Amino acid sequence: VVKKIIFTVLCIIIILAGISIEKDKLNSVKYSKVNYITYNMNVNPEDLQLTRENTVRDKDLLITLFEGLVKEDNNGEIVPALAKEIITSEDGLEYTFILREDIYYSTGEKITAEAIKSFFKGFLSDRNNVYASSLDCIYGAKEFREEIGDFSNVAINVKDDSTIAIRLNYKNPYFINIIANPVFNLRDYGTLDRYKENFTSIRYTGPFVIKDVKNDGIYIEKNQKHYERIKITDETIRITFLNSEENTLAIFEKSTETNTDYFSGSIDIMMDAPINELLRLSQNSMVKSFNGSAVYYLSFNPDKETVGGDVNFRIAINSLLSKEYYSQLICKELLTPATSYVMETDETEQVFSIFGDTEKAKEFFNKVNINENPEIRVIFEKNNLNRRIVEDLSIDIKECTDSEIVLKEYSKEELKNAVDKGDYDIVLQRFDFSYRNPGEYFESFHKISNNNLISYENEEYYNLINSAKYEMNDEKRKIIYEECEKILRNQLISIPIYNINNVICVKEGINQVYVTTTGNIRLEKVKEVP
């Protein structure tokens, strides 16, 4: 009996030990799987200034590691960040920022108004900074950039350690939106060229700090000095830089880890999936969509000697566009049919239809003098989404006319040269709104605008834009822009076709990932759940 009892006890001990060992193994497997969440960023920035090119993806690091006076929240609203309060003067020209009491660099030093001012000085001093001119609305900033005056003449003034005031040349209702761009996030500007070697000495101001830099990516973790550290995820995040859409997607969809010469581990979050795969990924519930700040337009050659210069041709194209149909075929999360020239809200009036009218299109094609111009030349900047859009357009055109359709793709610089030469009838144009100003697109048609791609000429239109720029009354400015819209609508020099949303691919079990309207990912709340 005693032996039986001893045997039974030993069996129980062995079983329990086995369970314990197995549990440890399971925990080990689980730990290795959830030790970090991997986000593939595609591009691999050389520095953390990130102001030499107007690109979006590399700014993901700025929004992750640094923070500015204000920021865009997860609902697309501009909210205080390092500043706790913003006071605007009655004339709308001066903005006073009251800093939070509990803001510190990751190294422990207090963040002061003087540090904010020093950042703006470094930012404006950088001759290679493509964003510097966006601060020309600040009194004295343009002169300082052009070395006409010194920084003491720039109206960025420290009142005390926690108060900084910025005065503008003219009222700009979108000034707060401008400085919400991640490029204005506080950092020691000009000292971040070799950040991968010097990451331990960087003074971070954002929700994360760089924990480690390895061959397989950058590892970031919570900034323990951040004023909202309680709300920031405890997850470690690995940021990788695999720049092939196809390879990234293949790894993202694998249920096991990858070990190759160019990548190890798995990918949980990815942007910029291949266009031809988005619909399938969407149908498999792997795509999340967020409001964007860009619109696709078809712009026409204004030369009346070309097909594009014939208003009947432009009316025909506007009539045949099957925006709703093709947006569904590409991916409804990525593209939504555009019904207005400006960024759309619930209050935006629908000016353009989202459905095609083949009979109306044929009617106006018959009015076009196309005998001398048998080809319809459609040009676009080379990328897969652009190619897909113009191919869909050509299908619609072929249903309404026997004219030959010639599609030509170019690099960005080549496209501009082709437009300057007038070697096109239609050009597909993507316009990125910097700060949701409804007048931003209208201003792009002014003769002095760098964005006036098609060299539109209309003195009446120019005068309206000039008056809108200096109109202090918001309601009057809105009326002026409505007049601009009427001119463009009547002449149909351009047609909005799609609003571009920001889409992200996220594995099941990864929650609370957000993307800003300008396309940057927010990871401070990301969680992996069972």
What are these regions (language model features)?
Residues 112-114, 118, 165, 235-236, ...:
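Alpha-helical secondary-structure segments
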Residues 225-279:
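Ligand-site clamp/hinge motif
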Residues 40-90, 121, 203:
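N-terminal lobe/hinge region of extracytoplasmic solute-binding protein
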Residues 132-189:
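Surface-exposed binding/hinge segments that line
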Residues 167-239, 246:
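Gly/Pro-rich hinge or "lid" segments in bacterial periplasmic/extracellular proteins
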Residues 403-415, 440-507, 530:
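Extracytoplasmic/peripheral linker and loop segments enriched in polar/acidic and small residues
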